[in-house]
């Protein structure tokens, strides 16, 4: 059995508690733990990143937790601003890189999987741009790491390795 969890970054400790209580349960943390950058967190991106990163590091210590990488908006800290053209994969990769690389470093490629989150994601970029951004972020990864990020980790998390 597996459990997909979508929650916000202040709730990440709850995933750790569930993972500790049920070590045989495969837990998949969706959307990089959804860092909140609006509402009461608006203008506090550096503080949010620091808090989120520490929580991701803590949750990643549980071997039964995997993480889905994606579902981040483009208009995050470092975003260039509104433009008449949609962002390309290079711009998306630049915006997402610090968040996704933090997750990959914490969980390792073997427990990290890319996710598209379409059709919701089309609000920020096209399907092709999203996946090309993932390819850009993965450019320095080994062939084995790329296999994990793009398919292997998901197959293990959902126990469907026989389909690869």
Model regions: which residues?
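Catalytic pocket-lining loop regions of alpha/beta-barrel enzymes
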Residues: 1-113
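Tryptophan-centric aromatic hotspots in well-structured domains and transmembrane helices
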Residues: 3-6, 52-55, 91, 118, ...
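Short histidine/acidic/glycine/proline-rich micro-motifs that form metal-
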Residues: 73-74, 118-121
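Mid-to-C-terminal alpha-helical segments outside catalytic/metal-binding sites
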Residues: 101-102, 106-113, 120-164
